[in-house]
């Protein structure tokens, strides 16, 4: 009767009545009712929300071996709701439910193995558990198993297998899988390269407000891949993703404003979007905002700020920023002139194929002694070993 009141089947939906009847059954030891009463307390439906009370009812059902309650109690331990956060206790309850072939618990236990929470990190065990849940149709497990195959974690890297699992999740309308399968089609990994199919999949996910898919669809519109080139559409999709905090979209929307593509050219607006991405550590945005700061395009010219931004991007290995920082040192712009440091940054960028850096390395070396060049080359090697950090 409680179930009918909760679902509104044969009676008007009434969570208070559902709670009343669940409680009567739960107090007689009915595990199904105990779990469902716990759900009402967790969601604040028909009762005042109370996570401790939810955990108490879940535990009573879980101790009777009820798999759904065991999984729900595990979730409470992971989140620290109604109980003290304790991953090992979560593992215990997930494992009991997973042993009863509960797909949610199999997936949740797999997550803990992937993160190394409450257990030793083990991608192979993650893959095994995801597979069990995925074969039962658990969409999150299907997508995440695809990710493991794409990245080669816990399984041999296999793009075709990744595509297979993404596709199963796509068939259930899962936006993350739609985006992930779209990426494989765009890159031609595990499937024949097909920009139109990539665009179709991105659009499905983008219309579900998936920020990564919105960005990726914008990218296709900007490049004219799988769709007619359309900067207005690119700007539209970049903006939707950027407003959700996608740093790549924020940077690319800034580029459109800087170039007046699909929007009215506005360097201040470009700087605004670059700055949002910079705050998230996006190297391309750091470089692009540095360019605006250096060139004074409707923003305050500040060579020191440009050098600071170039350095942030250079320390992330961005060749164009390494070249730009080298140029600043070579010309004493925003930093004290230093040909040894300039040569070092030119070296690093040139080794990545940056043609401007290659030319400047040759040019600046003409005014340097062999000892200075040797010092610069040693600094460049040490900088690479430190992953470009603290190179000055």
Report residues per predicted region.
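TPR/TPR-like alpha-solenoid signature
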Residues: 20, 35, 71, 107, ...
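Terminal, low-structured helical/coil segments at or just beyond the last alpha-helical repeat
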Residues: 356-392
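Hydrophobic face of amphipathic alpha-helices that form TPR/SEL1-like repeat modules
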Residues: 3-7, 36-43, 72-79, 108-115, ...
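Short helix-capping/linker turns of helical repeat alpha-solenoids
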Residues: 7-9, 14, 22, 27-30, ...
